[in-house]
UniProtKB/Swiss-Prot annotation:
InterPro entries: NAD(P)-bd_dom_sf (IPR036291), SDR_fam (IPR002347), SDR_superfamily_enzyme (IPR051122). Short-chain dehydrogenase/reductase; part of the gene cluster that mediates the biosynthesis of paraherquamide, a fungal indole alkaloid that belongs to a family of natural products containing a characteristic bicyclo[2.2.2]diazaoctane core. The first steps in the biosynthesis of paraherquamide is the production of the beta-methyl-proline precursor from L-isoleucine. They require oxidation of a terminally hydroxylated L-isoleucine to the corresponding aldehyde by enzymes which have still to be identified. Its cofactor is NADP(+). The lineage of its organism: Eukaryota, Fungi, Dikarya, Ascomycota, Pezizomycotina. GO terms for cellular component: membrane. The chain crosses the membrane at residues 25-45. Gene3D superfamilies: NAD(P)-binding Rossmann-like Domain (3.40.50.720). Belongs to the short-chain dehydrogenases/reductases (SDR) family. The gene is phqE. Pathway: Alkaloid biosynthesis. Keywords: Alkaloid metabolism, Membrane, NADP, Oxidoreductase, Transmembrane, Transmembrane helix. It is an enzyme of class 1 (oxidoreductase). It is found in: Membrane. Pfam families: SDR (PF23441). This is Short-chain dehydrogenase/reductase phqE.
Length: 265
């Protein structure tokens, strides 16, 4: 009788992982999880000091990791004039003399959207530079820096806002839906490379705290009441969805929801 194959736990060991938006929150947790699996990680962020601090935190958490396996690249994804060239620079640095295996994009404009009656053309378009234009520029250039095969992946980020919008978040909900639709198109255009989306629910990050301000405690209580598990999400838990999509070579065009059952209540 042929023995069953032994499950592998080292699938990401030595893989090159690029995390765009990796200085805090879910993105930082993805960086840490990837390093924990033995990956070589490149972090992209817009704030030089945050990048420096994030690298220091990761090196402290993984002291046995080769310092050269954690690389930081500054890139302002909100600037439409430079976003394409900045993204190509990040791809070049992440690839080094090899190829990138996985790209994760968690970057987003985390400022609270204005009320519907105060919307302007600029306030509607601005979040789209990071949420739509930047991923498309990544997709445009990644074939030069990745092997187009099922072992390679691009994972985008939407959110539960797509299916259950909160009042005042129409613009962001629209972009979340657009990201999911775009991912399916990219899964076709970039095949056999895999393209997927993670759609988080209420995840408590520093950026969320900053946005909510004094309303934070009430928002947490409301989110917990909406969840079937009775709690909000942590970046560390949600990061596992991104790791799964790197490992499952049969997942493409998929949306992985990690929202504590909030869509059921």
């Amino acid at each position: 009788m042929t023995p069953a194959p032994t499950p592998r736990t080292d699938q990401l060991h030595g893989s090159r992982v690029l995390v765009i938006g990796g200085t805090s929150g879910i993105g930082f947790a993805v960086c840490a999880a990837a390093l924990g699996h033995g990956a070589i990680v490149t972090i992209v962020g817009s704030n030089a000091q945050k990048l420096k601090d994030s690298v220091a935190r990761l090196k402290s958490s993984f002291p046995s990791t080769d310092p050269d396996d954690i690389v930081a690249v500054r890139c302002d994804l909100s600037n439409s004039d430079t976003v394409e060239q900045d993204i190509e620079k990040a791809l070049q640095l992440a690839a080094g003399n090899s190829k990138i295996n996985h790209i994760v994009i968690t970057a987003a404009d985390m400022t609270a959207p204005p009320p519907l009656e105060d919307l302007t053309v600029d306030s509607v378009q601005r979040p789209g530079i990071i949420r739509l234009v930047a991923p498309l520029m990544v997709a445009k250039h990644l074939p030069k820096y990745m092997n187009k095969c099922p072992q390679s992946s691009l994972t985008l980020t939407s959110g539960a806002h797509c299916l259950r919008p909160d009042p005042g978040w129409t613009v962001i909900s629209g972009y979340c839906g657009a990201v999911e639709a775009m991912s399916r198109g990219l899964a076709i255009d970039l095949k056999p490379l895999r393209v997927n989306v993670v759609a988080p629910g209420a995840v408590l990050t520093e950026a969320v705290k900053d946005i909510l301000g004094d309303a934070y405690d009430a928002a947490v209580e409301m989110a917990e009441a909406k969840s079937t598990v009775g709690q909000t999400g942590s970046p560390e838990s949600v990061a596992q969805a991104y790791i799964y999509l790197m490992k499952d070579h049969y997942a493409s065009g998929s949306v992985v929801s990690t929202n504590g059952g909030m869509l059921l209540v």
